[in-house]
């Protein structure tokens, strides 16, 4: 056969699992059963683009090891009775997402990106620890001679790498298009795909009736410049509210990124227009340090770290006594949205943080103490004072490396 799955099986048969993983390109997750050795192997692609859940459910003779690409599949197992994991709930309320290896359910886990898990059967109730088959750190350490390259060298190499990736992605049995927001990342992906396509590509954009948030004109200008077959959908707050009841069905577990709402709508519009595969600019900010938090923490810490902690605490308290409206009047030409609110947030952090790591984590935390929001959290004797680092999702640790 010629399908991806059949090709994968043929490669494993010829080379074994580890070499096949090393030679693989793209996104995947799979489970493969070795009948001869009673061995089940689960594996996930390098960056975790494809999900893979696994864990234990049931009790007594009904206790079983289960796995699947969606939590909904695991929940369909007849004896599934796993409760909400309250520590995962704390992580969700603090960081707006639940990162691997945790999941919203007790004893159910996400296989981490670039990891594999081997399970010998029959199942004895114990889950072995997953192991990395690929590591981003090893790639970074292997290529540490960056100083000899110029900025233009990096730009040219980046264009070569992106072009190669786009060409690989454009090999498809169905029409291909892009989600075009008009920003740098999606515009770059669209331009490269259009350049390497033999025919006009389709682009899709979501705009908003509220012109404050509407960036559709930028996307339209890019589409016109590139000559794409552009589709624009303008949505209202009512349209967004209509989507919300669908989210629990669409996503396996909660996450608080509001972009999931327009993303669902643009996917629906693309599908209705005959498009089954689309590329987007997601991940650009994470890869290239595009978020403010990456440089705010070191800049702020450099300015306040020389002060003794008690002095920082006192200044933070004094700043909080000044209303946010007054701070807006005092900003004197500083081009920062919601300046007063941000001064208050920073001042609150100054009262507690004692290191740059604590400052970074506090700035990306939605709640200072989410444990207080969860019913019976303390009475169940879960350690409320355990180190904040225990909650840190893997992607946030990677952010810190930037």
Where does each model-flagged region fall?
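Cysteine-centered catalytic environments shared across enzyme families
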Residues: 1-252, 263, 267
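Glycine-rich active-site loop/lid subdomains used to bind and stabilize high-energy intermediates
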Residues: 58-60, 120, 142-143, 221-231, ...
């Amino acid at each position: 056969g010629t399908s991806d799955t059949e090709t994968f099986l043929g490669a494993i048969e010829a080379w074994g699992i580890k070499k096949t993983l090393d030679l693989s390109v793209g996104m995947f997750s799979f489970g493969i059963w070795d009948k001869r050795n009673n061995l089940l192997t689960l594996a996930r692609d390098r960056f975790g683009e494809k999900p893979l859940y696994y864990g234990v459910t049931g009790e007594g003779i009904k206790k079983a090891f289960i796995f699947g690409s969606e939590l909904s599949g695991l929940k369909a197992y007849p004896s599934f009775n796993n409760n909400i994991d309250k520590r995962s709930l704390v992580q969700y309320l603090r960081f707006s997402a639940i990162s691997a290896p945790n999941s919203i359910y007790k004893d159910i886990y996400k296989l981490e990106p670039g990891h594999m898990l081997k399970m010998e059967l029959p199942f004895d109730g114990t889950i072995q620890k997953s192991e990395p088959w690929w590591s981003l750190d090893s790639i970074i350490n292997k290529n540490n001679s960056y100083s000899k390259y110029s900025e233009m060298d990096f730009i040219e190499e980046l264009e070569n790498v992106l072009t190669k990736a786009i060409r690989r992605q454009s090999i498809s049995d169905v029409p291909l298009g892009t989600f075009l927001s008009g920003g740098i990342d999606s515009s770059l992906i669209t331009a490269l795909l259009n350049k390497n396509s033999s025919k006009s590509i389709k682009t899709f954009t979501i705009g908003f009736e509220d012109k404050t948030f509407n960036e559709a004109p930028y996307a339209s200008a890019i589409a016109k410049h590139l000559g794409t077959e552009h589709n624009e959908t303008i949505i209202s707050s009512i349209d967004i509210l209509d989507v919300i009841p669908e989210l629990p069905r669409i996503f396996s577990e909660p996450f608080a990124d509001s972009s999931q709402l327009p993303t669902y709508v643009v996917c629906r519009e693309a599908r209705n227009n005959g498009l089954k595969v689309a590329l987007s600019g997601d991940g650009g900010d994470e890869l290239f340090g595009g978020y403010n938090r990456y440089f705010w923490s070191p800049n702020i810490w450099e300015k306040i770290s020389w002060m003794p902690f008690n002095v920082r605490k006192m200044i933070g308290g004094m700043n909080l006594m000044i209303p946010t409206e007054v701070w807006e009047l005092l900003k004197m030409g500083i081009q920062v949205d919601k300046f007063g609110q941000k001064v208050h947030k920073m001042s609150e952090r100054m009262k507690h943080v004692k290191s740059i790591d604590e400052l970074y984590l506090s700035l990306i935390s939605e709640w200072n103490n989410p444990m207080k929001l969860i019913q019976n959290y303390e009475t169940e004797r879960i350690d409320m004072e355990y180190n904040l680092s225990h909650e840190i999702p893997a992607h946030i640790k990677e952010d810190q490396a930037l």
